[in-house]
Every structure is written in C-alpha cells, then in structure tokens.
C-alpha cells in the first residue's frame, strides 16, 4: 500500500517536525519560543504543532547558520512566509514547482533544496506511519511493525544501541532493512514518555550482540 504523504497544510507534532526538519526537538521548541518561525505556521492547541511545509524553513534556519547571519536568515523566512501561506493548499508536487528564490540587494538565497529535503523526509514519515499498527489483540496494544509481532520501539532501541542490520535481521527475520529504517524514524517522531529502552531491554527471542559485565569491587573496612 502506498503511503499517504502529509499535506503541506498538515500540522505536525513538534517531535515529527524535528524529524522532518532534521533538527533536535529543542531546536523546534526554540523556533517557536523565539518566534523565528512565523506564528501563522504554529499551533499551540493541544500541544505544539508546526505546519508541515514550514519544516523546510526550520531546516534552512539551522543548516545555513554558518554561512548567513541571523538577520539574513530571518529576512529569507519572512519573504518565504507569504509564498508558503499562499501555497499551503497546494499538494507538495505543486509546491516544488514554485520559485523559492529570495533576493535581497546583493544576496540571493535558494530555498528549494530545503523544500525538497523536507518533502523527501515527509515521504519517509508517511511510510513510517504506514508500517506501524496497534491492536489490543497483539501484545496488548503495543505498536508493532505491520504484519509482525515485533515492537517498533524495540527495533528503534536496537538501532540506537548500534546493532548492525544483519544482526537485527537475524533477531527479527520478519523484517527487512527498510522496515528497520522506518521503525527508527517512527520512534523518533513519536518518542516514548519516561525512561528510554536500553541495551538490556531487547525482546525475548532477539539476539544480543555483546554483553559486557563488570563485577563490583567489595568495599573494604
């Protein structure tokens, strides 16, 4: 089944926007708190949300920091604001045909690479959403990779722990490399609350790559 790509006007959770913008959640909160991102592209109702199309502007702001001053970056975002506001009802295919060049005196900034990058990562987010399912009949409603009983967050924890794809495929033969990649994206976009899973939390039947244990010294005296 082909994944449905989020629309330009869809409001993404802050954690999803961080994935699409390829920045940290802290950076997303910063562009909201410091009004770097225009208020028209932000919603604070029922949590923080960001316009999907505006993720391109977040990516631009941070990726261009070494080459452009904050004033130049903010100027470009303000110019792009009107264009994006007018184009927010368009599909992404049409948005990518728009002119995203910003001119200011001797400075020319091309925002198209950031638009294209955000579009590609939104495709990944849509695909990640598509492979995840949850049912009370499967592991008590734990999110799993569709068609399997493999918990999504266990796969993501294994990726974060540095396990190789080959080892993970041995542990979960019902997966493939693409599903592992998308499971990691889903978990990053929808982080669990509380303590993160750690190395020893791999599910029953999975393969542990290494297990170093250090004996505690007994206290003397």
UniProtKB/Swiss-Prot annotation:
Taxonomic classification: Bacteria, Pseudomonadati, Pseudomonadota, Alphaproteobacteria, Hyphomicrobiales
Transmembrane segments: none
Pfam families xref list: DUF433
Gene3D superfamilies associated with the record: Winged helix-like DNA-binding domain superfamily/Winged helix DNA-binding domain
Keyword Oxidoreductase: no
Protein name, per record: Uncharacterized protein y4eO
The organism of origin for this protein: Sinorhizobium fredii (strain NBRC 101917 / NGR234)
Keyword terms, alphabetized: Plasmid
């Amino acid at each position: 089944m082909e994944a449905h790509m989020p629309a330009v006007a869809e409001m993404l959770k802050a954690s999803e926007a961080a994935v699409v913008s390829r920045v940290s959640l802290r950076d997303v909160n910063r562009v909201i708190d410091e009004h770097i991102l225009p208020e028209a592209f932000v919603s604070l109702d029922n949590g923080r949300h960001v316009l999907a199309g505006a993720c391109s502007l977040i990516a631009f702001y941070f990726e261009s920091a070494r080459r452009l001053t904050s004033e130049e970056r903010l100027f470009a975002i303000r110019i792009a604001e009107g264009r994006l506001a007018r184009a927010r009802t368009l599909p992404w295919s049409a948005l990518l045909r728009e002119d995203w060049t910003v001119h200011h005196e001797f400075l020319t900034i091309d925002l198209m690479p950031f638009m294209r990058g955000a579009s590609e990562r939104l495709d990944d987010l849509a695909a990640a959403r598509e492979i995840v399912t949850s049912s009370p009949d499967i592991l008590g409603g734990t999110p799993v990779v569709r068609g399997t009983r493999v918990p999504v967050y266990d796969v993501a924890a294994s990726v974060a722990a540095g396990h190789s794809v080959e080892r993970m495929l041995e542990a979960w033969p019902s997966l493939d490399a693409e599903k592992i990649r998308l499971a990691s994206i889903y978990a990053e976009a929808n982080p669990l609350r509380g303590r993160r899973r750690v190395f020893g939390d791999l599910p029953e039947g999975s393969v542990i790559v290494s297990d170093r244990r250090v004996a505690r010294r007994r206290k003397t005296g």
